[in-house]
């Protein structure tokens, strides 16, 4: 029973590891895939592009500040990797280039990525440490659980930061509203007094 449960959990873990996408890239356009990645995580990717004579595709991986982490021109099939230095939204862009005189056709692009615990080779770890297959699976699940816990901690931290920002914004809006009302009341009072003096000067009122 325990082994069956472990195998089921392992299969669920494998289902969550590795992300693969496939799309068609229109000539002379670019498509970017973006994802939030924690700090100090290894990202490994593998890509393949359908071959069309006279057309080329470049790829570039960068962060929100525009720092280039990986780049390759005229790609067909290959791999890339980079390390995330800080928590940020990282993007991988594929750029199609077709000569002006050529009528381009869409190219098919496939991309498979892994990050963090997904990049570990547990088979190699098992062989080096002389672990049994069941122990390797347990090690995989342990690392995956730690990764999920870190993700939840980070999400909770970001939630608290957003809540604090929201509360500060609400306080500023309330202060600005009160200040605006005080200004309007002061202006209205000044107008009433001014008109009262004006009408008295014109002897329209006593």
Swiss-Prot record:
Lumenal side stretches: 21-172
Q: Name one GO biological process term.
A: endoplasmic reticulum to Golgi vesicle-mediated transport
Q: Does the keyword Oxidoreductase apply?
A: no
Q: How does it sit in the membrane?
A: Single-pass type I membrane protein
Which ranges of this chain reside in the Cytoplasmic compartment per its record?
Answer: 194-206
Identify the domain of life. Eukaryota
Query: Where in the numbering of this chain does the GOLD domain appear?
Result: 30-140
Q: What is its main location?
A: membrane
Could you tell me where this protein is found in the cell? Membrane
- Where is the chain membrane-spanning? 173-193
Signal peptide (residue range)? 1-20
Q: Which Cys-Cys disulfides exist here?
A: none
Gene Ontology CC: cytoplasm; membrane
Pfam families named among the record's database cross-references: EMP24_GP25L
GO molecular function terms listed in the Swiss-Prot or TrEMBL record: cargo receptor activity
* Keyword Signal (UniProt): yes
Q: Which PANTHER family match?
A: TRANSMEMBRANE EMP24 DOMAIN-CONTAINING PROTEIN
Q: Which family does it belong to?
A: Belongs to the EMP24/GP25L family.
Q: What does this protein do?
A: Eca and bai are essential, though not redundant, for dorsoventral patterning of the embryo. Specifically required during early embryogenesis for the activity of maternal tkv, while the zygotic tkv is not affected.
Q: What is this protein called?
A: Transmembrane emp24 domain-containing protein bai
């Amino acid at each position: 029973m325990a082994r069956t449960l472990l195998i089921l959990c392992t299969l669920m873990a494998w289902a969550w590891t590795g992300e693969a996408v496939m799309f068609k890239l229109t000539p002379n356009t670019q498509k970017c895939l973006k994802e939030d990645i924690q700090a100090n995580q290894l990202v490994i990717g593998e890509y393949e592009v359908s071959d069309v004579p006279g057309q080329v595709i470049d790829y570039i991986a960068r962060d929100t500040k525009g720092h280039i982490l990986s780049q390759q021109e005229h790609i067909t099939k290959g791999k890339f990797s980079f390390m995330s230095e800080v928590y940020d939204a990282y993007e991988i862009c594929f750029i199609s280039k077709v000569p002006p005189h050529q009528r381009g056709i869409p190219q098919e692009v496939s991309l498979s990525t892994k990050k963090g615990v997904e990049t570990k080779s547990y088979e190699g770890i098992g062989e080096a440490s002389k672990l049994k297959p069941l122990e390797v699976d347990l090690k995989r699940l342990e690392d995956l659980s730690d990764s999920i816990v870190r993700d939840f901690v980070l999400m909770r931290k970001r939630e608290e930061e957003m809540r604090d920002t929201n509360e500060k914004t609400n306080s500023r809006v309330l202060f600005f509203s009160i200040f605006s009302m005080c200004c309007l009341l002061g202006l209205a009072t000044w107008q009433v007094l001014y008109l009262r003096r004006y009408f008295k000067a014109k002897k329209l009122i006593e």
